[in-house]
Amino acid sequence: MTYNALSTSSAAGALGFIDFMTSPERYRHWRLGFEGEVAELIMQVDENAGLFEGYQLKLNSYDLGVDIELADALQRLRFEHPEVKVVVLKSGRDKMFCAGANIRMLAGATHAHKVNFCKFTNETRNGIEDSSENSGQKFLCAVRGRGGLCAYRLRA
C-alpha cells in the first residue's frame, strides 16, 4: 500500500506528491536508538533536505518532511517496540534544540499547505500524548540549548 498526498505547496513545483512512507534507514532528520527500556530520539535536521526547494532548515527548524519522519518514529516506538517505557527526545546539535517551524517554508506555502502542515504537526504531537496515556511510554525532552518560541511543543 502506498500513501501519497497531492502537494498543496506553491514550492512543490514538479514534485506533485508528498510521500508519507518512510523508515528509520531513510530518515534524514532523526536518529532512533535503543538501550533496554529506554529509547533515544535525536533531532538533527539536515539543513539541505527540505521537502521543497527555496529554503534551508537552519537551527533544527522543521517542515513537513521532518514531521513525517517524527510521526513514523513515534508509530514504530509504540507498535514495534512495546518494551520501551521511556523515550528521551534531544537535539543532535550543540546549544540548539529547535528553532521551530521553518519561516521560509511557511512563506512559500499556500494557505492550504499551511493548514495541513499545522494539522499534521498537531496530530503528531497528539500521538505522543496518546502513547503516554495508552501505551505506557513516557516522553522526556532533554533540552541543552535554545528552543525558539515556536519550537516543538512536546506536551508529553
Residue ranges and their predicted role:
Residues 141-154:
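Gly/Ser-rich catalytic serine loop of serine hydrolases
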Residues 2-88:
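Conserved CoA-thioester-binding segment of acyl-CoA-metabolizing enzymes
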Residues 53-56, 102, 154-155:
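Surface-exposed beta-strand edges and their flanking turn/coil or helix-capping segments
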Residues 51, 99, 151:
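Short acidic, gly/pro-rich beta-turn/loop elements at beta-sheet edges
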Residues 29, 81, 111-113, 151, ...:
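Histidine (H) residue identity feature
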Residues 36-44, 63-112, 122-142:
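A structural preference for short, pocket-lining loop segments at secondary-structure junctions
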Residues 114-118:
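A glycine-rich helix N-cap at a beta->alpha junction
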